[in-house]
């Protein structure tokens, strides 16, 4: 456990209906008939539910579960504006969606957030006057956890989170990151590659996994974005997210849902790629049997 059971220190209040309505009102500005928009709306609600369940599985009280839940509602706000501006969800081809979302919600920039004292290095340095340029007030009346929420949103898509974080901040960041990873596996099975990446099903099934990505996969860590060159590399990158799951509930949910196994069983028209995925499937099956224990984070 990153924080002791029952160790949530202050009462935080969330009106879930208000937060849901604010999210729906915000996304009404975008075309919900677009599969890409629908994808992210549905993803958001599933991640928020998973966040609450993960926090509850770690023995946290209702106020902490609510805090985790609302982080899920807020975590991908930037995706919709990213899609409108750039026509893609690929951060490397557009903008960092996590930073954009936090900017929209909190009305400041990443540099301003970094300068703010106490945002990630303390359990108590959270209270900040809200920037009225942001829209976080549409979702939440209680501002006592704004800094923690902003930190979690800005950190949810990073390869690694800041080691200087307090245990409490790290706990909530890991809850959000786990929930997001669990549902990303589902999204990559349920939606066509055209709706997620700048590629087609044909391209995906007729390319190979690059050697760098194969080597990285065997190191049992998530694959860095800069290594991904081919459409198949992106699928392997998604599979590799399972290496970074922190909580036992998350691993159990992945096993129950079955999407990780389905991605590992990807069928390619290229015989070399097919052999690569057979190796990926066997390696991931072995890893999941011996994954770190409950709440443990890997070193290295």
Name the predicted role of every residue range.
Residues 23-29, 133-143, 191-198:
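Short low-complexity stretches enriched in small and charged residues
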């Amino acid at each position: 456990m990153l924080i002791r059971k029952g160790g949530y220190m202050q009462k935080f209040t969330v009106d879930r209906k208000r937060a849901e309505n604010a999210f729906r009102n915000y996304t009404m500005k975008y075309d919900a008939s677009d599969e890409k928009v629908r994808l992210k709306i549905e993803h958001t609600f599933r991640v928020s539910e998973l966040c609450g369940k993960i926090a509850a599985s770690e023995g946290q009280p209702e106020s902490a579960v609510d805090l985790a839940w609302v982080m899920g509602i807020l975590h991908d706000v930037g995706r919709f504006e990213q899609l409108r501006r750039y026509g893609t969800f690929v951060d490397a081809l557009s903008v960092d969606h996590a930073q954009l979302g936090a900017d929209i919600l909190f009305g400041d920039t990443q540099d301003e957030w970094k300068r703010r004292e106490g945002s990630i290095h303390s359990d108590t340095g959270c209270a900040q006057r809200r920037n009225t340029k942001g829209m976080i007030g549409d979702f939440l009346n209680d501002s006592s956890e704004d800094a923690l929420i902003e930190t979690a949103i800005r950190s949810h898509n990073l390869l690694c989170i800041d080691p200087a974080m307090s245990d409490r901040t790290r706990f909530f960041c890991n809850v959000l990151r786990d929930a997001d990873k669990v549902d990303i596996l589902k999204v990559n099975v349920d939606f066509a590659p055209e709706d997620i990446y700048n590629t087609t099903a044909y391209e995906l099934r007729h390319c190979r996994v690059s050697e760098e990505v194969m080597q990285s996969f065997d190191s049992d860590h998530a694959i860095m974005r800069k290594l991904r060159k081919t459409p198949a590399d992106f699928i392997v990158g998604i599979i590799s997210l399972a290496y970074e799951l922190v909580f036992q509930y998350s691993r159990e949910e992945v096993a129950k849902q079955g999407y990780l196994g389905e991605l590992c069983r990807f069928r390619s028209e290229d015989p070399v790629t097919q052999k690569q995925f057979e190796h990926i499937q066997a390696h991931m099956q072995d890893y999941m049997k011996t994954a770190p224990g409950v709440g443990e984070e890997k070193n290295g």
